[in-house]
Every structure is written in C-alpha cells, then in structure tokens.
Curated annotation (Swiss-Prot):
The gene is lpxF. In this organism most lipid A is tetraacylated without a phosphate group at the 4'-position and a phosphoethanolamine residue at the 1-position. The keyword Cell membrane applies. This is Lipid A 4'-phosphatase. GO terms for biological process: lipid A biosynthetic process; lipopolysaccharide biosynthetic process; response to antibiotic; symbiont-mediated evasion of host innate immune response. Its main location: membrane. The keyword DNA repair does not apply.
C-alpha cells in the first residue's frame, strides 16, 4: 500500500508542473490521444453491441449522456458565476482566460466507459479501460487544458453515474440461433439450434 501511495504521489508531482502549455511534440501527441480517448464510450458500446448486450449498451448511453449533461451544466454555471463576480478560481483553465474548466468533459467521457465496464463486466476487463481513462486525464493536464482537480472531479462524476446506472452483466444460459449449412451433395440445409449451459 505504501508503494502504491508513493507511486501515486510521484505521478502527481510529475504531472503537476506540466499544467501549462505543452512543451514538446510528445505533449501535443498526448493531447491528441486524449482527444480521441474521450470517445471511449463509443468504443466500449461497440463491444457491448457485438456481445449483443443491448441492456448494457442502453445503460452506457444513459450514464454517459447524464454525465456529460451534468458536466456541461456545471461548466456553464461556473462560467456564469465568474461573470457575476463570484470567486471560482478552481474553474479557470490553466491555459487561457476561460472559466469553463471545471469539471473536465474529456475525463467524464473516458471514465463513463471505465466505470461502466467495471460495474457491468467486472474489474479484470475494466483494467485496460481504466488505464486509458487515466491516460486521458493525464493528457488534459499535460496539455494545460485542466488542472488535476478538474480532471479528478470529472472522473468522479462519471464514475458515480456509472455506479448508479449500470447493472451487473448476466449472460443468458440458453441461446436460440439459426443454422445454415450445406451437406456433402451441396444442398442447402436450414435449421434452428438451441443450446443450454448447466
């Protein structure tokens, strides 16, 4: 546990000084990777669709849409509050004079997918998705678009809605499927197959 805390603290200390503008080509590439990974719910949804997990696909869609709605509502509220004279320094983007930095929408998108996979399919399939979501958060901080607090809040909002909207996946024990084949003479054969797992 101490090693994990030390690793986490080292990561924070490494990322925190880089919250200004990207300093090299690698930072720009990382920013572009984060821009793509914010669409993780689409990639995860495609996998759910391929598994014919339509309920899971619906839960992912609802969780992601609610997450993005709340995040963009908060961004607008903090921006309006700043215009009205409120002290909302935590909502300012590090890169520029924008007050729509809190919370991070990219982080919300990526962690919507990570939380969904965790609660729907379990922790083992969720590990790579969580790693990609953390990479998305890191890319936003390195690019100077968000602070660590902003990406953390966006991630927590997404994880919370994934918890609320996602149910555990229970594969069907039985399956009914069409069978289309040909026999040794070349004649087509059609049928219906049924399988049941004990």
């Amino acid at each position: 546990m101490k090693k994990l805390k030390g690793l986490f603290l080292s990561l924070l200390l490494w990322v925190y000084p880089l919250k200004s503008e990207p300093i090299n080509e690698g930072a720009y590439i990382l920013e572009e990777i984060g821009d793509v990974l914010r669409f993780l719910p689409i990639f995860v949804g495609t996998v759910s669709l391929a598994m014919r997990d339509y309920r899971g696909l619906g839960e992912l869609a609802v969780g992601t849409l609610v997450t993005q709605g709340v995040i963009y509502g908060l961004k607008g509220a903090f921006s309006t509050a700043h215009k009205d004279g409120a002290r909302v320094g935590f909502a300012k983007r590090p890169c520029c004079n924008s007050w729509r930095g809190m919370p991070s929408g990219h982080a919300g998108g990526a962690f919507s997918a990570a939380g969904f996979v965790y609660y729907r399919y379990g922790w083992k399939p969720a590990l790579p998705v969580i790693a990609l979501a953390i990479l998305t958060d890191t890319s936003r901080v390195v690019a100077g678009q968000h602070t660590i607090l902003q990406v953390t809040i966006g991630s927590l909002i997404a994880w919370g809605f994934a918890y609320l909207f996602t149910s555990r996946y229970k594969p069907k024990r039985w399956m009914l499927y069409p069978e289309i084949s040909s026999d040794f003479k070349g004649s087509s054969r059609y049928g219906v197959g049924f399988s049941y797992q004990w």
